[in-house]
Amino acid sequence: GLEGGKVVGVTDFGAPRLANWAGNLTYGSSGVAHPANPEELADVVRRSARVKALGSRHSFGDVADTTGTHVVLDRYDDGRAPVEVDPASGVVSVAAGLRYGDVTRHVQAAGRALANLASLPHISVAGSVATATHGSGDAVGSLASAVVGLELVIGDGGRRTLRRGDADLPGAVVALGALGVVTRVELETVPTFDVRQDVHVGLPWDAVTAHYDEITASAYSVSLFTDWGPDGVQQVWRKSRLAPGERGGTRADLFGATPATTMLHPLPGIDPVHCTPQLGEPGPWNERLPHFRLDFTPSNGAELQSEYLVPRGRAQEAFAAMRDLGPRVTPLLQVGEIRTVAPDPEPLWLSPFDGPAVGVHLTWKPLPDDVARVLPDAEAALLPLGARPHWGKLSHALVHDPGSVAALYPRVDDFGALAQRYDPEGRFLGGYVERLLAG
């Protein structure tokens, strides 16, 4: 409550500075607010010259940074159930700060499913959507593509509700936190389904060159794990969609790759206890689409990540470029992952998925200086192909030349105008987003 002109019990000033999950970034915020209700949130926004929502802190760059107050919604209660599934429309309304793994249990209990999930269930809904985070699958879009509505608090502390059909929604879904503090997200669901996960090992590069489209079309969601060395793809994870109760089957040979006979972790030699069940054992979508289980911490954060979203028609050129960089990249990698993403059904202004895309993802060892030296060369090879850096991961261009990234998005000026309208005083600017919008 308010007492003597200051917000009591809401802001931890003087607390140790927050760091992100990976530990590679210490945020610049001067305090952290944990508003308990809409009134407290509006008050924090109005009182702060600079303010920014902070999610599960799984971004590797400074997309969510601010010099002012960070807002964390872990104690926020808008008087509604955190997860509400509308039985008529199938739309699920979600408290924005929740993690996907917590949301999906409720959705599954209601007999519904989200079409896709990211590899980690530990990430917040609002933060994932705002950065166009994604899983894999030729026919399934990013997490942002499921959004049909948003509620947010904008620069003057007022509330906005956007739904499908509102002119602002396509600009507000992938918004990098620049329009306000999102408090609720509405997601489309589908009837529940099961998934079986089969892993193949030892896919030669020749097979990737000749049969990539067939490989990615062979299951609902396909991920290729490689270190970009001469040996090719070490593991292919194939997640096949089944009707509940159906068992499905696998294939003995996958263009030279053979079925794994034990559970595997994407990183060689790591205990797969953290991973979702493989070996063709069917289970509900929410326990198979992520690579990692919610009840295990997937790693201690001792890693860095980059990712480039390449137009699908240029994928083979991107693979060739990465293989050429192999001698420099492989020694720094924990693992690389290649995924596919379907285009957004309705264009989202700052989404990299305006057409079919292939994600070239890199999980680096925690060697920030070495990674920083190789990123410019990787981007010099990939960005001319039309690749866009993932908004939440490490990128040389996002830090040093955000204008070059802005130029990859035809609607970026419209987005800037939208941000100006929702936040005329620039309260929600910070990190690279400020430089991106400064043009």
Q: What is each PLM-predicted segment?
A:
Residues 1-8:
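Short, Lys/Arg-enriched N-terminal segments with co-localized hydrophobic residues
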Residues 23-122, 129-137, 224, 338, ...:
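Glycine-rich N-terminal segment of FAD-binding domains in flavoprotein oxidoreductases
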Residues 40-43, 102, 208, 235, ...:
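Short, conserved charged micro-motifs
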Residues 61-80, 135-157, 181-188:
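Structural signature of FAD isoalloxazine-binding scaffolds in flavoprotein oxidoreductases
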Residues 87, 108, 154, 351-352, ...:
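Non-transmembrane, aqueous-exposed alpha-helical and coiled segments at domain scale
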Residues 148-328, 332, 340:
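C-terminal substrate-binding/cap subdomain adjacent to the FAD-binding core in PCMH-type
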Residues 288-408:
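Substrate-recognition/cap regions that form aromatic- and gly/pro-loop-enriched pockets
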Residues 385-439:
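Activity-critical C-terminal alpha-helical subdomain
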